[in-house]
Amino acid sequence: MKPFLVTLAVLLLFFQVTAVGSIEKCWNFRGSCRDECLKNEKVYVFCMSGKLCCLKPKDQPHLPQRTKN
């Protein structure tokens, strides 16, 4: 039982360390939260942290076009 608990503790510590250095993701993990978007990215929504959710054009949702009546 002791080796199991030690292994579990090491794995939990490993996952916490790697999560700190990762970039915050948004829009179903398709976008990245940044202060400024890259040249080929566009802003679609805001992240929970207040940063911009930057999406590449291929990952942006297709919005319906308004039709004139």
UniProtKB/Swiss-Prot annotation:
InterPro entries: Beta-defensin, Beta_defensin_dom. Disulfide bonds join C26-C53, C33-C47, C37-C54. GO terms for biological process: defense response to bacterium; innate immune response. Keywords: Antibiotic, Antimicrobial, Defensin, Disulfide bond, Secreted, Signal. It is found in: Secreted. Gene3D superfamilies: Antimicrobial Peptide, Beta-defensin 2, Chain A (3.10.360.10). It holds the Pfam family Defensin_beta_2. Belongs to the beta-defensin family. This is Beta-defensin 122. The gene is DEFB122.
